[in-house]
Amino acid sequence: MPGPWRPYIADVIAGNCDTYLTDFADAAAAFGHPVLMTFDHEMNGSWYPWDATDGGTSTGVTPAQWIAAWNHVTSLISAIAPNVAWVWAPNIERGGSAVSAFWPGSGGQVSYVGLDGYYVNTGTRWANRFQSSYLDVESASGGSCPFMVAETGIPAGDSNAVFQIDNLLSGARPAGAVAVMYSDKGAYAMTAAMQSKFVADAG
């Protein structure tokens, strides 16, 4: 989208990006197949310009503004392209970044509740990386939407990587995850052994 980041959220809320959004929605509708979309994901992290975790001190974006922008974007696009499904995707919580502050409520569209998070070392497990945040997103949403792991990866060079594939899917399955989106690139690109384990366990 056009424009610098600080006024960008305000521009979205004000409707100044509606032409761009409408063009996208028209293209998505013409595509005619299901499309999974998110908007300004990982909003509770500190690495994107739409970070709203400190009440706007760093980026000028507050949780309330982020929600207003989400609701505007999702409502506009969904009215034109009902084939677009929306994934609300905060990052796993990392101190002071509670997801509940960013739940859009009933003012916009949420089709799936997602959670982004990566395994970082041999000691990473679903229980110590995802579980508490999973419970929080379910609480924030009231269990109103299906859950998915919206973005994840496991370091391919980790000697424990194949086991961690099993751990990831073993944790996601009881959580009722309908999908696990794996970022198969860079340091997280799967080895043949990881691919085989993923396919076998996912089945």
Indicate residue ranges for each PLM-predicted region:
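Glycoside hydrolase catalytic-domain groove-lining segments
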Residues: 105-159
